[in-house]
Design a protein with these regions (language model features):
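Extended alpha-helical targeting/anchoring segments
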Residues: 1-238
């Protein structure tokens, strides 16, 4: 991964891995008890409790909320540490630029309406601090006639792939050496006018493997990246 970055084939690579966990609950029971922004369950396959929006469509506008930057919120001054970390600043800027370009393919007058705002996610192990941005574009009047094309044109989500997207996807496939399946795909609800969708992260498979990951850049430290991946392994049952 670092070699591909060093020779300029990618600026940001979202690398993921599996962690074996033990639970007294089935994934269906976890779904019924999970407390998360988005929950998704596919029988005999997976349960997902994602904090990340993929895109929203409302009143003819499309919004994306790339999430890049994670920290254990119990660390003293965690918010400022995360917001001032140069690696995280660079990673987030790369992702915002990628998503802005993605939205420009399906909408007009694209702009960043919120940049690097901090939120906390509650887990049994303690809170996680995460940083997101909001990007907005204006859709064509007849956008609902091509909603499928719009979504597929934005896939895969930038936050779980990297930049440049297609080359980075190829690097990820070679490094992970395993199909992600449903993991890091999207799910959502569309009523014919408005859409709300999520990226399938914070993901537990029926075989007991939990999948998590993070963004790798030229400034990444292996131990810090490993710790971030472990911090993201949690089941939000309270």
């Amino acid at each position: 991964i670092k070699k591909e970055i060093e020779i300029g084939n990618s600026f940001l690579i979202n690398l993921t891995a599996k962690t074996r966990i033990n639970s007294n609950y089935t994934i269906g029971e976890i779904f019924n008890g999970a407390n998360a922004k988005y929950t998704c369950y596919l029988k005999d396959e997976f349960v997902c409790f994602s904090p990340e929006t993929f895109v929203k469509i409302k009143d003819g506008k499309i919004y994306s909320y790339p999430m890049k930057g994670t920290i254990n919120a119990s660390i003293p001054d965690a918010k400022n540490i995360l917001l001032q970390n140069q690696k995280e600043i660079s990673e987030h800027a790369t992702m915002v630029d990628l998503i802005r370009n993605d939205l420009s393919r399906v909408s007009k007058n694209v702009k960043v309406t919120k940049y690097r705002y901090y939120e906390e996610i509650v887990t049994q192990e303690g809170n996680l601090g995460q940083v997101s941005s909001e990007i907005m574009g204006e859709l064509a009047v007849n956008y609902n006639e091509n909603i499928g094309d719009t979504l597929f044109d934005l896939l895969p989500a930038g936050s779980i792939s990297g930049a440049p997207k297609q080359k980075t996807v190829n690097i990820i496939a070679a490094a992970e050496n395993e199909d992600r399946g449903y993991y890091t795909g999207i799910a959502g609800y569309y009523d014919g006018k408005n859409l709300d969708s999520t990226v399938l992260i914070r993901y537990l498979q029926n075989d007991g493997y939990y999948r998590s990951g993070g963004g790798i850049t030229c400034n990444s430290d292996a131990l810090n990246e490993y710790q971030e991946m472990i911090d993201k392994v949690y089941v939000p049952l309270f």
